[in-house]
């Protein structure tokens, strides 16, 4: 019977405990009823921000803030900033001693309070003047250190083949990242992180610097796209050598193309003989005037010297044949010539007939 009773109690106890309302313990100061963020920017100023007031927490539109360092008299916020015409935060100056921050509803009930060193909410400025340089297969990263201690500098890098960031950290902004391939393009970024043992868990790291791209075989910032993977130990060919090989290959291709075109042209269009070999002086003396060249060539032919005309006359020896009258003789150059053979002797031409001859 007792065992049954304990079994029933064990079954009902979780339900009874779940029905009892519980209060969430507060993690902050007295009267916390809204979310407040405090940031100490590079130990130069303190920024306190909170929600939009009544729109989220059912409170009055504007809250008031008081602060003091050490045992000073509480002071009102020197500079509020607004969000949608409602107070949303306050910027405080730096001071010595513990910082106490109090938020009130219209100057009455306390809604939030904190009391710590301002450095407990430290957020350093991002590193500046960061320099990256290749040394073999490592990249040296350096930048000026902050004016206060307790920071750790973190460098992250990645390449086009591994998009996940890889981290390297050191207590000073002078560190090296090893195991890199100079033929690849890498992205780098740097930030400063407060150490927990020095500032506490509420300190926040700085923002990342802008991403800088770097490649070992090219000028700084020359990364224009993904690079092809290389076999380890194989040096990257210089750009000049690659360009020279490309030019030589292109020249060889052009020469082969020209030679092939010349052979095709010779097969389709046979060569035309040069008239200078067959007609000497045609172009040198007569400028291509063929008629003038013919006249000059005929004038240069040696002529046979003329003999006595009486020797060239052949007189018929037949008796009883009378000489033709003058009016029967055909004048030289007459277009109406009789029949007979044309004969040239020396520079004279004769038309031979059956009964005589005629001088032309």
Swiss-Prot record:
Mark the transmembrane ranges: 239-259
The compartments listed are: Membrane
Disulfide-bond pairs as recorded: 77-90, 185-223
Motif WSXWS motif at which residues?
Answer: 205-209
Which residues lie toward the Extracellular compartment? 27-238
Describe, from its UniProt entry, the tissues in which this protein is expressed: Expressed in all tissues examined including brain, thymus, lung, heart, muscle, stomach, small intestine, liver, kidney, spleen, testis and skin. Highest levels in thymus, liver and testis.
- The keyword Isomerase appears for this protein: no
Q: What's in the keyword line of the UniProt record?
A: Disulfide bond, Glycoprotein, Membrane, Receptor, Signal, Transmembrane, Transmembrane helix
Q: Where is the Fibronectin type-III domain?
A: 123-214
Gene3D superfamilies assigned to the protein according to its UniProt record, in alphabetical order? Immunoglobulins (2.60.40.10)
CDD domains, per database record: FN3
Q: Which InterPro entries match?
A: CRLF2-like_D2 (IPR048648), FN3_dom (IPR003961), FN3_sf (IPR036116), Ig-like_fold (IPR013783), TSLPR_D1 (IPR053856)
Q: Which GO terms describe its molecular function?
A: coreceptor activity; cytokine activity; cytokine receptor activity; protein-containing complex binding
Sequence ranges on the Cytoplasmic membrane side: 260-360
| Signal peptide location | 1-18
- Membrane-topology descriptor: Single-pass type I membrane protein
Glycan attachment points: 62, 129, 174
The similarity comment for this entry is:
Belongs to the type I cytokine receptor family. Type 5 subfamily.
Provide the assembly information: Heterodimer of CRLF2 and IL7R.
Domain remark text: The WSXWS motif appears to be necessary for proper protein folding and thereby efficient intracellular transport and cell-surface receptor binding. The box 1 motif is required for JAK interaction and/or activation.
Function, please? Receptor for thymic stromal lymphopoietin (TSLP). Forms a functional complex with TSLP and IL7R which is capable of stimulating cell proliferation through activation of STAT3 and STAT5. Also activates JAK2. Implicated in the development of the hematopoietic system.
What is the protein's name according to its record?
A: Cytokine receptor-like factor 2
